[in-house]
Amino acid sequence: MKFIDTAKFTIKAGNGGNGAVSFHTALFVPNGGPNGGDGGNGGSVIFEADGGKHSLLDLKLQKQLSAQDGFKGDIKNMHGAQGKDLIVRVPVGTLIIENKTGTILADMDEDKKQVLVAKGGKGGKGNARFANSRNKAPTIFEAGEIGQFYEVKAELKVLADVGFVGLPNAGKSTLLRAISNSKPEVADYAFTTLNPQLGVSRAKDGSTFVVADLPGLIEGASLGKGLGHQFLKHIERCRVICHVLDMSGNYGQEDVIKNYELIRSELVKYNYKLDERPEIIVANKMDTDEAQLNMMEEDIKKYFKDKKVVFVSGLLKDNVDELLLKIAKELETAKYVPLWEMEQDIYEGIKVYRLEEDEEDIQIINKGNGRWEVAGDTIYKIYQKFPITTDDNLLLFNEKLKKSGVYDMLRERGVGAGDIVKVFEYELEWMD
């Protein structure tokens, strides 16, 4: 399957079903009480990490993913059915990001982990809920709430314990073949590896871990040069970084240490937290004549005196056992570093992402010629919840607007009798 690590699409939770307006009717009971049932809740959009998936190709082909709407209430106090949740399965290691703000909505970092990202709308109440001693036959009902809607980007960041980084042709793929069961393509040209390659390695102490051969980096990668951002993002989840150096002299006069500093700089520019990860220096291609002639081992040890250094040959598998043991030792204490801190609620065992609602003031707009427009989140919720299709709902709609303070605001702005006040799709005549 083609490796796709980003996909953009929209998600839409189901709307809640409308409450019903109905009355009990039976022989010899012409004026029975209200018995309109509630609407069902809309289905939610839930993301689930699936260890069997390795690409976002199927999501790349989608434009919108929608959960089912809740069903409307019915007569005889029958409640509408709940809309079915939509489960969206993604590879382990996928981030779900809100497009407009860049906010991370979910970090799918564990197999079977579920996160509710778009919550379904609550079902509206039927008229049976509004009966009281003053109004025994109400025609009041609520419309179902609108389900949440987001434009999102899914971004797969490979989940591995160890990441091999270095310049193109440093021998990372050959080294991965030497220490694992992975068979990445190997050739003598730059950017042989265009996608992360994973392998499972076992050290002599019996410990096992996942190693990622990450595509070669070049100067400017942190700014996106040479597909830098596509490569660097996969390093963020690795608990240990193995920096592979080419000791063969293939870079001519370029100094091995300067090459290291170049790549290290790109890592930190991309994400400063990468500077905190444990690092092992892997001096590779020690089997070559150039490596023997250059006699750089002492210089390398001196420069990296505060780091663990291993001299290996991926081609001949020389000293790879020592490398594996050093990696295993580092992993004993290397902690997983979360990419974000998510405040979450728990909803039926599923982690739920809660967007913080913006505090938006009510907006009064004077359109001129006796026309006004009212807007804002508070007003929209009233407009959406109470359709003015019955006399009782019209009275309740006006009462809710009054309590919101919008009437006082209109008076302060100079609204007069006979003026038209537009509340979204409704046009109301001011009667003061």
From Swiss-Prot:
InterPro entries listed in its UniProt record: G_OBG (IPR031167), GTP-bd (IPR006073), GTP-bd_Obg/CgtA (IPR014100), GTP-bd_prot_GTP1/OBG_C_sf (IPR036346), GTP1-OBG_CS (IPR006074), GTP1_OBG_dom (IPR006169), GTP1_OBG_dom_sf (IPR036726), OBG_GTPase (IPR045086)
OBG-type G domain residues: 160-332
Binding site for GTP: 166-173, 191-195, 213-216, 284-287, 313-315
Pfam families per the UniProt record, alphabetical: DUF1967 (PF09269), GTP1_OBG (PF01018), MMR_HSR1 (PF01926)
PROSITE patterns for this protein: G_OBG (PS51710), GTP1_OBG (PS00905), OBG (PS51883), OCT (PS51881)
Domain of life, source organism: Bacteria
MF terms in GO: GTP binding; GTPase activity; magnesium ion binding
UniProt subcellular location: Cytoplasm
Gene3D superfamilies linked: GTP-binding protein OBG, C-terminal domain, GTP1/OBG domain, P-loop containing nucleotide triphosphate hydrolases
A GO CC term attached to the entry: cytoplasm
Single biological process term from Gene Ontology: ribosome biogenesis
Keywords: Cytoplasm, GTP-binding, Hydrolase, Magnesium, Metal-binding, Nucleotide-binding
The keyword Glycosyltransferase is annotated on this UniProt entry: no
Domain OCT: 354-432
EC number: 3.6.5.-
Residues that coordinate or bind Mg(2+): 173, 193
Location of the Obg domain: 1-159
Principal place of residence: cytoplasm
Stated role: An essential GTPase which binds GTP, GDP and possibly (p)ppGpp with moderate affinity, with high nucleotide exchange rates and a fairly low GTP hydrolysis rate. Plays a role in control of the cell cycle, stress response, ribosome biogenesis and in those bacteria that undergo differentiation, in morphogenesis control.
Subunit structure comment from the entry: Monomer.
HAMAP family tied to this protein: GTPase_Obg (MF_01454)
Recorded family membership: Belongs to the TRAFAC class OBG-HflX-like GTPase superfamily. OBG GTPase family.
NCBIfam families, A to Z: Obg_CgtA, Obg_CgtA_exten, PRK12297.1, PRK12299.1, small_GTP
Name of the protein described by the UniProt record: GTPase Obg
Origin species: Mesoplasma florum (strain ATCC 33453 / NBRC 100688 / NCTC 11704 / L1)
Gene name for this UniProt entry: obg
